[in-house]
């Protein structure tokens, strides 16, 4: 969830491209619920609420919603969640993640704050 559009403005001010999907706490109905992108030979799906069934047309699902970090492979699809900075759940620490893609490989590093 972005929640406040000023947060999005701050992210954009960092000078890097920003892709947003709408979360359950976001009021901007213009933001898409799902975005598919290809990077480094991999197909990614960005969506706030993770699907119950692994999609068959992507390699990686990047999601939020649970506020719990996740790095789990299901049905050949890698599910990644960086956790949450402001309101982590289930005893998880506040966290962010770094995602690097090179030669069709993913390097995922969770960073506790």
Where do the PLM segments sit?
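Active-site neighborhood of phospho(di)ester-bond hydrolases with catalytic His/Asp-centered motifs
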Residues: 1, 19-24, 45-48, 60-65, ...
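Core catalytic region of metal-dependent phosphoesterases/phosphodiesterases
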Residues: 1-40
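Short coil/turn segments at beta-strand junctions that form active-site/ligand-binding loops
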Residues: 16, 57-58
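Binuclear metal-dependent phosphoesterase catalytic core
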Residues: 36-40, 56-57, 73-75, 80-113
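A short, sequence-level motif marking secondary-structure junctions
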Residues: 49-52, 113
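Active-site environment of divalent metal-dependent phosphoester hydrolases
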Residues: 3-6, 25-31, 51-55, 62-73, ...
């Amino acid at each position: 969830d972005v929640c406040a559009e000023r947060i999005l403005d701050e992210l954009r001010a960092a000078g890097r491209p920003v892709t947003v999907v709408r979360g359950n706490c976001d009021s901007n109905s213009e933001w898409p619920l799902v975005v598919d992108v290809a990077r480094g030979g991999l197909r990614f799906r960005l969506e706030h609420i993770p699907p119950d069934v692994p999609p068959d047309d992507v390699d990686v699902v990047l999601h939020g919603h649970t506020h719990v970090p996740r790095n789990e492979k299901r049905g050949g699809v890698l599910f990644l969640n960086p956790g949450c900075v402001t309101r982590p759940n289930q005893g998880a620490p506040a966290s962010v993640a770094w995602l690097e893609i090179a030669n069709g490989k993913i390097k995922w590093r969770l960073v506790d704050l």
